[in-house]
Amino acid sequence: RELAEAFHLPDTDNLNEEKLNDSIIWKFSDYTELTNENRKLLQEETGWSDEIVNAIKTSEEADVYKSAGLKDVNGNLERTDIDWGAKIPQDRIDRMRSLFGDEVADKWSDKTNLDLIREGKAPYGPDGERVNLHHIGQKPDSPLAELTNTEHKTNDGILHDKTKVSEIERPVFRKEREVYWQNRYNELTNQ
């Protein structure tokens, strides 16, 4: 019943408790849990570390990261398709201008993705949206995966266990993201 209320299902008082639980479990059991054998094969295929592979819960989740072409670097899954010299998309600058005025928009108009990460801000990905950091396995100390906004949104149900409350503390994660992107800047500029 708590899950039904969490998902705002209508008229749960008149539903049979067993049928309600079965329907909710069915909704979230469409995914294939990774077996030890699957984990071994995934690691051989991708070269990802034990920490990353062990944090992945389902084969569908693994497919999201593989399809994104993510590479294991320093225990996180990084994108290889970010154009670091690309400027902030013009539609974003135009939006800044309409919301905050010329002074703010002009300040940001010449900034590149590399400039953004130096300041601890997410770069723009190939979909023209900010890159999202995702905790693989949804634990606060999980490895991070760089996903486009599109990948993160369209795979929401695969990446996030909707049957439980998130363990990620948003204020802590906000600071973690800032430090992550600054470290990524240092990694890129010290090569």
Each predicted region: which residue ranges?
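Nuclease and nuclease-like effector domains acting on nucleic acids or nucleotide cofactors
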Residues: R1-V131, G137-Q191
